[in-house]
């Protein structure tokens, strides 16, 4: 029983970590630069209508 509880706890921690990382991607700020080559691939610019963004 203790083993199952430990696994469940580890699973919850993993899910929380992934969620916060996802939020960081969604919260990328628009960049004043127009150079698309400087845009990090992890930024979700399409979600905020930006051509370029900075994290």
From Swiss-Prot:
Entry keyword annotation includes Ribosomal protein: no
Keywords of the record: Copper, Metal-binding, Metal-thiolate cluster
UniProt-listed InterPro entries: Metalthion_11
GO BP term, pick one: cellular detoxification
GO molecular function, one term: copper ion binding
Origin superkingdom: Eukaryota
Family designation: Belongs to the metallothionein superfamily. Type 11 family.
Protein name: Metallothionein-3
Natural source organism: Yarrowia lipolytica (strain CLIB 122 / E 150) (Yeast)
Gene: MTP3
